[in-house]
């Protein structure tokens, strides 16, 4: 059986690593096709439990070429009516991780665990038994249903403090909430390790930026807007939508 993945963002890389690792003792060919001219995002990312074991195909925290940091849970600040802070702590015998998408991509493509093809293709034209479409956010939202979300914009910043905690932070703000991803200072994603989320139909970008800088000691780097959506037909014959090609909803 042959499985092809189109796209080398987070979803594409993790899908390829998953099938190459768990299918290594089976008659399974794994191929990742990507356009090298499309760069992955530089925003700091965080996984749930389980993802680090996929990187165990060649990753460890001693030879940490992707500058990942351990994630032991999620700290919520300012959301509780009784407690100012509360933590969703992971079991002590497990770990998730914080990572940079472009460094993860380089690691995955050079891992030697699957075939890599540089090309810009339509998933329906790929010769494989099953094809995962991981090409990221669509340009055409035909077939997608909007999802309700209180936020639709983000301001990204570089922390000016030592952000080496072993957990992600989600902080309630006057305009929505903010995430703080503890990234290695040498990682490109350190420039987008803090994100201030808000609704630009309610809060002006200038006001959100002012509040961001008042609450956090950051160097503002860039702004972006986004849609929240879900495709209603995730499987079309042998093509399966994955990652942001399937849906997007800003996590908390």
Language model features: what each stretch is:
Residues 2, 27-31, 238:
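Residues at the starts of beta-strands that form the adenosine-phosphate
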Residues 198-252:
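FAD/FMN-dependent oxidoreductases across multiple families
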Residues 1-11:
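Beta1/beta-strand and adjacent pyrophosphate-binding region of the FAD-binding site
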Residues 8, 20-43:
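Glycine-rich FAD pyrophosphate-binding loop
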Residues 110-216, 247:
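Predominantly flavin-linked oxidoreductase catalytic cores and closely associated redox partners
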